[in-house]
Curated annotation (Swiss-Prot):
An annotated GO BP: P450-containing electron transport chain
Name of the gene this protein is made from: fdx
Details of cofactor binding: Binds 1 [2Fe-2S] cluster.
Listed name of the protein: 2Fe-2S ferredoxin
Sample GO molecular function, one term: metal ion binding
Keyword hit for rRNA processing: no
Organism the protein comes from: Buchnera aphidicola subsp. Baizongia pistaciae (strain Bp)
Amino acid sequence: MPKLIILPHKILLPKGGVFNAMKGESILNVALRNNVEIEHACEKSCVCTTCHCYIWKGASSLSICEEKEEDVLDKAWNLQFNSRLSCQAKINNKDIEIEIPKYTINQ
């Protein structure tokens, strides 16, 4: 079973965490199921950037970043090469390590 590793975040998860994930489950759904309240203003419909995260390990095993997600990501605060929307990035067979940005456009 793949794991979602979330690096420490000052507000949402001060000590970080490791959570079991199911293949095909989005990063956001794994986090929410484990009471990590990543903001998701658009209710997972891929129109905002509040669930933006950085993928530090396992990016190649995530679902492909579709054009719509890429277009929305262009509006994200502090966009980086490893940015994904956690509502769209689906976990496959490998462990994934992410960082939740310090800020979002809504914060």
